[in-house]
């Protein structure tokens, strides 16, 4: 590692380019301990290693005695301790709670430290001050944010098939607007997107899905009325066609509202998930249909990394967000950084995002890993003669900070820090 570059990257004020952080009272309502910090992602590795669903649920339940949970947790922890998910927790334990090694002697005193630090201001202490984060792009689907420098990314799709009527009733109540047909729902969508702007939203979030055929407004209006009347529209894939139509309309609204479309691509949290349905190349028809919209494609498209790099290189309306990928597979992240640095324009990349809901401490760990990985990868580019030191330093500044202001331009209107 080039020490000078490493020190620069570690000290740099940076953007946390993807979180789901809830308002702090959600974290403060829990009595956290050392095992609970593994609940969001590392618990998936425990399950993958063979822990039963029942034991995993018990191990992550703070209401169960810590001693019992440790007995369940410890054997499987030995199998997962070197995965990226566990490394993020271990980094947080070391830097924030003074625990160099989690074992029979340290789990109880470390848990006491974690509980004692679970106080108001925890997000700013761990991410803002200790983590040197100056801006958070936060997809908690709420207007309420945990810190003043966190800005909401909200829902692109207002309706989906599984909860159609419940969601519609919620929107009608929230906005005091009665929906009777497709035209009136499209009018409601416009009202909602204006509300997004009033509440400092900087982007809208969707998930990559297999492309559906295109239908016209007349056909969509017929489907809408049938669904509204709790009837199934005729045709095997009609629901997918209808919701694809609505998604296209939402993307058009996002473009007109200057909201970036953030897209989950690739790997899914959990176990036994079919993540092929969210493959990054499924996005290509949408990217072509909406050249005026901005798409920030998440998670390096893992495991389809080369495809993600190719899409970012080939499409003028795409940026590539490496959030979470540095936790899923740290080594793959570093290999990708080296490839991206020499293939994708430097203004199209966001380097990291913690991607947690109630775990600003674990996000700190994931972001610290990302900085170290970025430093190693760019040091390799210097060593190989592909980048000079000054070029690598400039690249890290763009990826970690300044690119966020062009990829999410609404941030410029609200951010309490200067570009």
Predicted regions and their residues:
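Mid-to-C-terminal alpha-helical segments outside catalytic/metal-binding sites
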Residues: 1-15, 35-94, 346-348, 364-419
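Histidine-centered catalytic micro-motifs
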Residues: 13-26, 261-266
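Conserved, mostly hydrophobic/aromatic
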Residues: 18, 136, 204, 254, ...
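Short Gly/aromatic-enriched secondary-structure transition segments
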Residues: 29-34
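Active-site gating/metal-coordination segments in enzymes
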Residues: 92-260, 269
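Active-site-proximal loop/turn and secondary-structure-junction residues that shape catalytic pockets
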Residues: 142, 158, 208-210, 267-269, ...
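Long, well-ordered mid-to-C-terminal structural blocks that present hydrophobic/aromatic surfaces
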Residues: 242-315, 319
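H/E-rich (His + Asp/Glu) clusters that bind or coordinate divalent metals
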Residues: 282, 292-419
